[in-house]
């Protein structure tokens, strides 16, 4: 069953799940919690299994992982309402990008990538789209949706007949349009006729507020803007009711031309469309009309941007890393680890099920969101179990210890997840298309993590204790309790961080554009079209240019153009690298070097040169093929011409020898020809200024939301500490990555977003224990903070180590693209762990010393909170 085609089932199940969760939270009776939670888990698991199975059909990868379809479109000059030519202006490319993005999103193709190509072209890449949807997409792209309402000439049929007979010429102010002829019974288009319309337009498509499919077959309901409605009303008032006709023109084709039977307002109906599919496409296009027509120049099937081998390696490495993490949790927490394993499995099932249910695709930034989700999920379980260890060590019974552990861990899990969720939602709202994959997976992942950690695992603990299968719990204890004075280490920590931050800023300042890849700066693209029977792999091309010293790291992609004889190799590179790349490919790859070139030696009057002399001059050269030498006598030339036809790769050797041989007289010129041409074009940055602006804007809004939330839930000094730690982590990570000689690309944007989420999560967990300790313990603030950091130290180390190991496996066994991604995250895990202890907490302490009564403000904040979120304030 495809749940995308059955939204009622999804909505009904969703309402039931939400109701059950509210019931679960509201009830205080453990047995009722257990039963309600079990039903909720059952519905969620069943719904997600239906959504995700069979996996290969339901889960869709992005174009960077699985390939898809690619279109190159060209913007054509448009027409105004009177039919006059409309020149293409500078903003036409951006207008077309925005419009097509909306159209394709409505068609379920939200994860597309669009890049300007030259001055008036666009490359559109769509993930997982095969030949079966190509006709629909072609229509979606090319449909200009130029809607016009025009008055029909009262004697249209008679005048057109006279014009065709040659007895009458076209009247000024009128224009002939094609009109559809439909079958009155089926409504299907069966032919085309002609109709005479006024050149003056009553209302244009720019006045359409909303277009949606109507109730009848081939019908669209259109709602005009207030201005459009006013113009239509004024126009129909001047018409003869019951006699005059008005035509609905779409893209220079008349759909219908009915008689006007009443004065019209903002609403009218468009009829005459050919079935439901055209109704859907046209209504979508009318809501997002193109200012300029688009012409599709080429269509291609494209392979995964990072190559099938890289994707396979990445999936294998990710599974291995996850397996190691789960194995560690299982060994370290024993039976509780087994329950955590169940919770993580449900978490992943919900994530994949929701992605399949809503038709979302997995991109490389999306995988970054999954990695962060796994880290957050493991962290939630570690938080609960470390609390459980404390409660059991304090002498509580098992059932009371479990209850206390979940209650005390709730605030840390809730706050950490909500802050990350705020950032994800704002990214989803404001970020560019390339980052929405990250935001979607992270949003779903955060919600599924909270459900799994706080409900699923607790329900299983209920069943274990109620059935007496769980009588006691034991854990490993590799990290004994410590009393490290972290706050006293703040000065050397600040010095170390200052050195790292200054170093990062210096590296970023000196490297500047040299640290940015083609994704950010743009460059050129060379297309190598192979012929039938010729084979060339991405790996072969990559190997051939691997040792070249290039300005930027090129990306190589294999494509299959529609209608072409053979495959097409597409290489994106820095513009200045073309000569190096072409020379190497021509010399090292046989089929690319094949071709026949000519060396001409033009003699002047009186000069003599024989074929034998030329042959002798080049006889000792090592050539791919024996050249043919021919003496010619061009008409009108002063002297003879020696023509040498040779393999193209031999051209330079022969030319060099002839120029150096003193016995060879005459003027030498060459004609270089290859069997396979290199088609070179300039390409704009895929992560250009608009991308950076949107990303920074979204991140800025996200940070403001997080700071506001932390100020509300904690105190303003905590918000300052969290911001300082996040700024510290991202800046150092960028600096280290650049220092290691890596070019920044889309991959790194996903990695840095993951690091930001990890940093916030890690910091909030430490802050939560500090808040609890400052409310409940007496003594110096620095001393209480030290106790809080020490209390969370085992959790901090365990979470960091498990996350680091999982990403390390990805770095060791993943492909080159995943190595860049995982390396950045490994740096982020180390720096984020360090900053949550040595930067965030000391900043809170220093800020609080500037006059704020930190302990009292936290107590006041807890009294102002809703009862279900506030923790008990200890009596003095």
Where are these regions (language model features)?
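Non-transmembrane, solvent-exposed regions of membrane trafficking/translocation machinery
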Residues: 81-259, 268, 587-620, 689, ...
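Cytosolic juxtamembrane regions of multi-pass inner-membrane proteins
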Residues: 375-416, 460-469, 742-798, 845-859
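Juxtamembrane "pre-transmembrane" interface segments
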Residues: 2-5, 266, 277-324, 579, ...
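Pore- and gate-forming transmembrane helices of large, multi-pass membrane proteins
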Residues: 100, 305-325, 341-344, 376, ...
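Transmembrane helices with small-residue packing motifs
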Residues: 18-31, 37-84, 481-488, 492-534
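Small-residue-enriched core segments of transmembrane alpha-helices in multipass membrane transport
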Residues: 37-49, 338-359, 370-377, 438-453, ...
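Hydrophobic alpha-helical transmembrane segments of membrane transport and translocation systems
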Residues: 353, 390-500, 813-876
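Interfacial segments of transmembrane alpha-helices in multi-pass membrane proteins
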Residues: 3, 21-36, 221, 225-247, ...
């Amino acid at each position: 069953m495809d749940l995308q085609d059955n939204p009622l089932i999804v909505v009904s199940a969703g309402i039931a799940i939400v109701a059950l969760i509210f019931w679960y939270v509201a009830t205080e009776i453990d047995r009722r919690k257990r039963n309600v939670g079990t039903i909720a888990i059952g519905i969620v698991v069943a719904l997600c299994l239906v959504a995700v199975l069979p996996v290969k059909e339901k889960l869709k990868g992005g174009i960077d992982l699985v390939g898809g379809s690619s279109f190159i479109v060209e913007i054509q000059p448009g027409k105004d309402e009177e039919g006059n030519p409309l020149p293409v202006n500078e903003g036409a490319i951006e207008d077309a990008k925005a419009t097509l993005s909306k159209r394709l999103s409505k068609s379920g193709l939200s994860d597309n990538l669009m890049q300007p190509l030259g001055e008036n072209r666009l490359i559109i890449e769509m993930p997982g789209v095969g030949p079966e949807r190509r006709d629909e997409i072609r229509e979606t792209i090319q449909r200009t949706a130029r809607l016009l309402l025009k008055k029909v000439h009262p004697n249209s049929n008679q005048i057109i007949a006279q014009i065709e007979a040659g007895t009458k010429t076209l009247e000024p102010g009128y224009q002939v349009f094609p009109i559809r002829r439909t079958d009155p019974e089926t409504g299907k288009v069966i032919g085309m006729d002609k109709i005479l319309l006024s050149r003056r337009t009553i209302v244009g498509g720019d006045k359409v507020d909303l277009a949606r499919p109507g109730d009848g077959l081939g019908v669209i309901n259109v709602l005009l803007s207030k201005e459009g409605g006013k113009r239509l009303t004024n126009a129909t008032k001047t018409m003869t009711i019951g006699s005059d006709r008005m035509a609905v023109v779409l893209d220079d084709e008349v759909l219908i031309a009915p008689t006007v039977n009443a004065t019209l307002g903002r609403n009218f109906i468009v009829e005459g469309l050919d079935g439901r599919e055209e109704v859907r496409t046209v209504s979508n296009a009318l809501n997002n009309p193109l200012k300029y027509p688009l012409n599709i120049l080429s269509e291609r099937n494209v392979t995964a941007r990072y190559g099938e081998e890289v994707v396979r390696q990445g999936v294998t490495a990710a599974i291995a890393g996850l397996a190691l993490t789960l194995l560690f949790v299982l060994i370290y927490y024993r039976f509780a680890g087994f329950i955590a394993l169940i919770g993580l499995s449900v978490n992943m099932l919900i994530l994949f099920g929701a992605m399949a249910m809503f038709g979302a695709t997995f991109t490389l930034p999306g995988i970054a969101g999954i990695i962060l989700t796994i880290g957050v999920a493991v962290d939630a379980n570690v938080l609960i179990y470390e609390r459980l260890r404390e409660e059991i060590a304090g002498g509580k019974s098992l059932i009371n210890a479990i209850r206390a552990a979940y209650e005390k861990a709730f605030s840390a899990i809730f706050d950490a997840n909500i802050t990350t969720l705020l950032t994800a939602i704002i990214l989803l709202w404001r970020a560019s298309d390339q980052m929405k994959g990250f935001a979607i997976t992270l949003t779903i992942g955060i919600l599924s993590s909270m459900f799994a950690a706080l409900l699923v695992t607790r329900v299983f603990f209920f069943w274990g204790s109620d059935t007496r299968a769980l009588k006691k719990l034991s854990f490993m204890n590799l990290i004994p309790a410590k009393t490290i004075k972290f706050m006293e280490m703040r000065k050397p920590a600040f010095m170390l961080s200052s050195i790292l931050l200054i170093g990062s800023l210096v590296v970023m300042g000196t490297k500047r554009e040299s640290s940015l890849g083609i994704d950010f700066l743009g460059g050129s693209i060379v297309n190598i079209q192979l012929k039938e029977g010729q084979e060339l792999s991405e790996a072969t091309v990559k190997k051939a240019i691997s040792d070249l010293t290039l300005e930027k790291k090129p990306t190589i992609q294999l494509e299959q153009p529609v209608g072409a004889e053979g495959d097409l190799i597409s290489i994106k590179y820095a513009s200045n690298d073309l000569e190096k790349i072409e020379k190497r490919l021509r010399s090292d790859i046989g089929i690319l070097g094949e071709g026949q070139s000519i060396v001409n030696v033009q003699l002047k009057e009186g000069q003599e040169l024989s074929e034998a002399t030329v042959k002798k001059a080049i006889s000792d050269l090592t050539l791919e093929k024996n050249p043919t030498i021919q003496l010619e006598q061009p008409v009108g030339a002063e002297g003879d011409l020696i023509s040498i036809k040779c393999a193209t790769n031999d051209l330079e050797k022969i030319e060099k020898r002839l120029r150096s041989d003193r016995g060879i007289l005459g003027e030498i010129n060459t004609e270089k020809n290859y069997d396979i041409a290199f088609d070179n074009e300039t390409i704009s940055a895929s992560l250009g200024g608009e991308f950076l602006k949107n990303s920074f804007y979204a991140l800025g809004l996200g940070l403001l939301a997080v700071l506001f939330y932390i100020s509300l839930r904690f105190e303003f000094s905590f918000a300052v500490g969290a911001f300082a730690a996040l700024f510290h982590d991202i800046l150092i990570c960028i600096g280290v990555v650049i220092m290691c000689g890596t070019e920044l690309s889309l991959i790194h944007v996903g990695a840095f977003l993951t690091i930001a989420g990890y940093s916030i999560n890690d910091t909030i967990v430490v802050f939560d224990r500090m808040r609890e300790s400052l409310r409940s313990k007496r003594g110096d603030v620095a001393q209480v903070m030290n106790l809080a950091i020490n209390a969370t130290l085992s959790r901090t180390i365990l979470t960091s180590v498990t996350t680091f190991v999982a990403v390390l496996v990805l770095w060791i066994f993943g492909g080159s693209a995943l190595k860049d991604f995982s390396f950045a995250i490994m740096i982020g895990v180390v720096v984020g762990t360090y900053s949550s202890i040595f930067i965030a907490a000391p900043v809170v302490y220093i800020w609080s010393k500037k006059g704020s009564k930190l302990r009292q403000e936290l107590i006041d904040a807890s009294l102002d909170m809703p009862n279900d979120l506030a923790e008990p304030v200890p009596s003095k």
